[in-house]
């Protein structure tokens, strides 16, 4: 554990230091399960799960228990009966496009669901709260898709508020990466989860009004050098030509036939016009708000972590 020369609300770890905090937490994922959770281009293996994610799962498990004691104390103060069900613990996972936050969220969901005290763990991405393409076009912000203003932030806030308030069922819209739009009539519903993970680009943003980040009990920022993220984005774009882009119904099907050189230029254009500006202007400035920062090296491996202790 790194010692700070100046007073700081953070404590920093290298991977060797962090892995000792796993204690006796068992590894409950198999290689086959991990393959199903791993995103395109991700290199995560069982060793990283054991050394990075198991200590994290243990920390969150301890914080879930502590948060429930806090809610019980507040109920006692108010003279209220303690609720039969625990208040859902909400985790935010933020980071750039192509940094691997979706894989982080899925692995965390799988690990946390193995703990007997919180077996119901739901994962929702903020993609479902993007405005439909027709609405983005009407507002003249289709080119700003992924920027904060392209999301229905009120709907997202209402969704998380209702989940945390104990509503029996709360439903979110579903986004398709094939059609590049909200799927009409399709919903993803959660039913009183013990833990809710909310994953998205801008989930840690703040503002003058109540924001979804104000409802998080724990938050994670997946970090890396901008140059590395750009490289991963281009690599993923090239790989998608043979998967999602190959579907004739895909919004980006016209990219499927590009040569490597053409696809690289197209990916760099999208990165420089949209993803990099969004990262620099909106996403990266929210990093200090995270409870935990996971820092990736150029090979995708997590080797440094920064935990907010205050």
UniProtKB/Swiss-Prot annotation:
<keyword id="KW-0173">Coenzyme A biosynthesis</keyword>
<keyword id="KW-0547">Nucleotide-binding</keyword>
<dbReference type="InterPro" id="IPR027417">
    <property type="entry name" value="P-loop_NTPase"/>
</dbReference>
<dbReference type="InterPro" id="IPR004566">
    <property type="entry name" value="PanK"/>
</dbReference>
<dbReference type="Pfam" id="PF00485">
    <property type="entry name" value="PRK"/>
</dbReference>
<protein>
    <recommendedName>
        <fullName>Pantothenate kinase</fullName>
        <ecNumber>2.7.1.33</ecNumber>
    </recommendedName>
</protein>
<keyword id="KW-0808">Transferase</keyword>
<dbReference type="GO" id="GO:0004594">
    <property type="term" value="F:pantothenate kinase activity"/>
</dbReference>
<keyword id="KW-0963">Cytoplasm</keyword>
<keyword id="KW-0067">ATP-binding</keyword>
<feature type="binding site">
    <location>
        <begin position="95"/>
        <end position="102"/>
    </location>
    <ligand>
        <name>ATP</name>
    </ligand>
</feature>
<dbReference type="GO" id="GO:0005524">
    <property type="term" value="F:ATP binding"/>
</dbReference>
<dbReference type="InterPro" id="IPR006083">
    <property type="entry name" value="PRK/URK"/>
</dbReference>
<dbReference type="GO" id="GO:0015937">
    <property type="term" value="P:coenzyme A biosynthetic process"/>
</dbReference>
<comment type="pathway">
    <text>Cofactor biosynthesis; coenzyme A biosynthesis; CoA from (R)-pantothenate: step 1/5.</text>
</comment>
<keyword id="KW-0418">Kinase</keyword>
<dbReference type="GO" id="GO:0005737">
    <property type="term" value="C:cytoplasm"/>
</dbReference>
<comment type="similarity">
    <text>Belongs to the prokaryotic pantothenate kinase family.</text>
</comment>
């Amino acid at each position: 554990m790194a010692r700070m020369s100046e007073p700081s609300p953070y404590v920093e770890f290298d991977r060797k230091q962090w892995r000792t905090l796993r204690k006796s937490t068992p590894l409950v994922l198999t290689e086959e399960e991990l393959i199903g959770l791993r995103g395109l281009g991700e290199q995560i293996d069982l060793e990283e799960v054991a050394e990075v994610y198991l200590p994290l799962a243990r920390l969150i498990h301890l914080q879930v228990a502590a948060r429930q004691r806090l809610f019980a104390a507040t109920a006692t103060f108010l003279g209220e009966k303690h609720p039969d069900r625990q208040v859902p613990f909400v985790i935010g996972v933020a980071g750039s496009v192509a940094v691997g936050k979706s894989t982080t969220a899925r692995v965390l969901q799988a690990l946390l669901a193995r703990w007997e005290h919180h077996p119901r763990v739901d994962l929702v991405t903020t993609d479902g709260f993007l405005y439909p393409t027709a609405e983005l076009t009407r507002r003249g912000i289709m080119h700003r898709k992924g920027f904060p203003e392209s999301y229905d932030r009120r709907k997202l806030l209402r969704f998380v508020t209702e989940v945390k308030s104990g509503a029996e069922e709360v439903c979110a819209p579903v986004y398709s990466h094939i059609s590049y739009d909200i799927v009409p009539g399709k919903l993803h519903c959660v039913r009183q989860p013990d833990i809710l993970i909310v994953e998205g680009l801008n989930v840690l943003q703040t503002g003058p009004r109540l924001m979804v980040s104000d409802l998080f009990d724990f938050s994670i920022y997946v970090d890396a050098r901008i140059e590395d993220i750009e490289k991963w984005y281009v690599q993923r774009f090239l790989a998608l030509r043979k998967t999602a882009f190959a579907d004739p119904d895909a919004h980006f099907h016209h990219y499927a036939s590009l040569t490597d050189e053409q696809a690289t230029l197209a990916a760099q254009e999208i990165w420089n016009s949209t993803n990099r500006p969004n990262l620099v202007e909106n996403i990266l400035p929210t990093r200090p708000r995270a409870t935990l920062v996971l820092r990736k090296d150029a090979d995708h491996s997590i080797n440094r972590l920064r935990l907010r202790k205050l």
